[in-house]
């Protein structure tokens, strides 16, 4: 029985990047062999085990054969006769098909080390086309490693284009599409994910409604340079969305979590506030705070201010926008602290109470912004 470190951990070590989790493959063993050593089996579709002390994942060497449509229809075969090379052959990219033995020896049957040096994302074999999810994985890796100058190999780009044309991507479940996109939004260059899918004519299949036009991409890049927040990055893509209904439909179609949808709707509904360098007049500001329910949900104003700051983060107005926001935050906090009970004690009731509360809040905002 031989044990090898595989996949992303080996790749990231070779790239001198932090290794966050380690996966292992076990060659020449049966499930019973690991169970006897105290491993806990967790994989239902294929034999994966948790180490009794480290809780890291150990998988028996296996091969796969496509048995139907989509990315889940595979027959898995695990046996002591499956070699390390057989196991690595089923992986997507050569940079992910490198192993390291327990004594530190690199095993690289598909020239992944060479592709790391050449900064190329290249498929391991023709079996790559059997799993449509790999199109999104390559796009995600392209986004993740773009800052290290990685690009997709020409023959792999051609294969991605052919997979897109085959309509295999239509068999992907929405949750998996979203998961890959969400991961790409965590990278330094999330625009690369979208541009690659656009270039291979896959964008309309997996993310209908995302155009990846210049305006959308530039705004996403600005927001990404300004903030690590996936929520802000996602919301920035929908600032110019035509209707709230189309945005809601898009989020339903991809099973996108509600907090992302709500943030995108907030951005879309307040496009003018985000994209106009001058703040609105005091009455409009007070109305905005009421509309977004600032008095109970102050985080909504903060999101709008962050998106607005990102919008001007590369302009000469950056400092003046930041100064505006500092004053607005202060004024909004003071306005929120205004107590309606005090006004009631002064004799205000009903509509008069509401009018007085609004007028005093407007006055507080005006004073804060002067």
Curated annotation (Swiss-Prot):
<dbReference type="GO" id="GO:0005524">
    <property type="term" value="F:ATP binding"/>
</dbReference>
<dbReference type="InterPro" id="IPR002646">
    <property type="entry name" value="PolA_pol_head_dom"/>
</dbReference>
<dbReference type="Pfam" id="PF12627">
    <property type="entry name" value="PolyA_pol_RNAbd"/>
</dbReference>
<comment type="similarity">
    <text>Belongs to the tRNA nucleotidyltransferase/poly(A) polymerase family. Bacterial CCA-adding enzyme type 2 subfamily.</text>
</comment>
<dbReference type="InterPro" id="IPR032828">
    <property type="entry name" value="PolyA_RNA-bd"/>
</dbReference>
<feature type="binding site">
    <location>
        <position position="140"/>
    </location>
    <ligand>
        <name>CTP</name>
    </ligand>
</feature>
<keyword id="KW-0479">Metal-binding</keyword>
<dbReference type="InterPro" id="IPR043519">
    <property type="entry name" value="NT_sf"/>
</dbReference>
<keyword id="KW-0692">RNA repair</keyword>
<comment type="function">
    <text>Catalyzes the addition and repair of the essential 3'-terminal CCA sequence in tRNAs without using a nucleic acid template. Adds these three nucleotides in the order of C, C, and A to the tRNA nucleotide-73, using CTP and ATP as substrates and producing inorganic pyrophosphate. tRNA 3'-terminal CCA addition is required both for tRNA processing and repair. Also involved in tRNA surveillance by mediating tandem CCA addition to generate a CCACCA at the 3' terminus of unstable tRNAs. While stable tRNAs receive only 3'-terminal CCA, unstable tRNAs are marked with CCACCA and rapidly degraded.</text>
</comment>
<feature type="binding site">
    <location>
        <position position="137"/>
    </location>
    <ligand>
        <name>CTP</name>
    </ligand>
</feature>
<keyword id="KW-0819">tRNA processing</keyword>
<feature type="binding site">
    <location>
        <position position="21"/>
    </location>
    <ligand>
        <name>Mg(2+)</name>
    </ligand>
</feature>
<feature type="binding site">
    <location>
        <position position="11"/>
    </location>
    <ligand>
        <name>ATP</name>
    </ligand>
</feature>
<keyword id="KW-0694">RNA-binding</keyword>
<feature type="binding site">
    <location>
        <position position="140"/>
    </location>
    <ligand>
        <name>ATP</name>
    </ligand>
</feature>
<feature type="binding site">
    <location>
        <position position="91"/>
    </location>
    <ligand>
        <name>CTP</name>
    </ligand>
</feature>
<feature type="binding site">
    <location>
        <position position="23"/>
    </location>
    <ligand>
        <name>Mg(2+)</name>
    </ligand>
</feature>
<dbReference type="GO" id="GO:0000287">
    <property type="term" value="F:magnesium ion binding"/>
</dbReference>
<dbReference type="InterPro" id="IPR050124">
    <property type="entry name" value="tRNA_CCA-adding_enzyme"/>
</dbReference>
<dbReference type="InterPro" id="IPR012006">
    <property type="entry name" value="CCA_bact"/>
</dbReference>
<keyword id="KW-0067">ATP-binding</keyword>
<feature type="binding site">
    <location>
        <position position="8"/>
    </location>
    <ligand>
        <name>ATP</name>
    </ligand>
</feature>
<feature type="binding site">
    <location>
        <position position="91"/>
    </location>
    <ligand>
        <name>ATP</name>
    </ligand>
</feature>
<keyword id="KW-0808">Transferase</keyword>
<feature type="binding site">
    <location>
        <position position="11"/>
    </location>
    <ligand>
        <name>CTP</name>
    </ligand>
</feature>
<keyword id="KW-0548">Nucleotidyltransferase</keyword>
<feature type="binding site">
    <location>
        <position position="137"/>
    </location>
    <ligand>
        <name>ATP</name>
    </ligand>
</feature>
<dbReference type="GO" id="GO:0042245">
    <property type="term" value="P:RNA repair"/>
</dbReference>
<feature type="binding site">
    <location>
        <position position="8"/>
    </location>
    <ligand>
        <name>CTP</name>
    </ligand>
</feature>
<dbReference type="GO" id="GO:0001680">
    <property type="term" value="P:tRNA 3'-terminal CCA addition"/>
</dbReference>
<dbReference type="Pfam" id="PF01743">
    <property type="entry name" value="PolyA_pol"/>
</dbReference>
<protein>
    <recommendedName>
        <fullName>CCA-adding enzyme</fullName>
        <ecNumber>2.7.7.72</ecNumber>
    </recommendedName>
</protein>
<dbReference type="GO" id="GO:0000049">
    <property type="term" value="F:tRNA binding"/>
</dbReference>
<dbReference type="GO" id="GO:0004810">
    <property type="term" value="F:CCA tRNA nucleotidyltransferase activity"/>
</dbReference>
<keyword id="KW-0547">Nucleotide-binding</keyword>
<keyword id="KW-0460">Magnesium</keyword>
């Amino acid at each position: 029985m031989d044990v090898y470190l595989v996949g992303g951990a080996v790749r990231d070590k070779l790239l001198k990047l932090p290794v966050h989790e380690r996966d292992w493959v076990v060659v020449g063993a049966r499930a019973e062999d690991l169970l006897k050593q105290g491993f806990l089996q967790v994989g239902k579709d294929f034999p994966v085990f948790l180490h009794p002390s480290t809780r890291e994942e150990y998988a028996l060497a296996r091969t796969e054969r496509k048995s139907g449509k989509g990315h889940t229809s595979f027959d898995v075969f695990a046996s002591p006769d499956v070699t390390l090379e057989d196991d690595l052959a089923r992986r997507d990219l050569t940079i992910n098909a490198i192993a390291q033995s327990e004594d530190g020896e690199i095993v690289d049957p598909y020239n992944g080390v060479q592709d790391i040096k050449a900064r190329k994302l290249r498929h391991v074999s023709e079996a790559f086309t059997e799993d449509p999810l790999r199109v999104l994985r390559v796009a995600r890796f392209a986004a993740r490693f773009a800052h290290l100058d990685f690009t997709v190999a020409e023959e792999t780009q051609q294969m991605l284009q052919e997979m897109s044309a085959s309509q295999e991507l239509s068999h992907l479940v929405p949750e998996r599409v979203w998961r890959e996109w969400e991961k790409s939004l965590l990278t330094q260059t999330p625009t690369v994910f979208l541009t690659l899918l656009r270039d291979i004519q896959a964008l309309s299949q997996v993310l209908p409604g995302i155009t990846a036009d210049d305006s959308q991409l530039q705004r996403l890049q600005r927001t990404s340079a300004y903030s690590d927040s996936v929520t802000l990055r996602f919301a920035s893509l929908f600032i110019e969305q035509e209707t709230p209904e189309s945005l809601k439909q898009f989020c339903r179609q991809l099973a996108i979590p509600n907090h992302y949808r709500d943030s995108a709707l907030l951005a879309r509904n307040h496009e003018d506030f985000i994209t106009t360098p001058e703040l609105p007049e005091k009455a409009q500001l007070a109305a905005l705070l009421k509309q977004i329910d600032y008095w109970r949900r102050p985080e909504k104003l903060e999101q709008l201010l962050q998106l607005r700051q990102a919008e001007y983060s590369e302009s000469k107005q950056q400092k003046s926008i930041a100064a505006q926001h500092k004053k607005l935050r202060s004024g909004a906090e003071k306005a929120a602290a205004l107590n309606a009970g005090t006004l009631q004690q002064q004799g205000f009731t009903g509509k008069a109470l509401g009018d007085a509360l609004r007028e005093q809040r407007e006055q507080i905002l005006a004073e804060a912004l002067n």
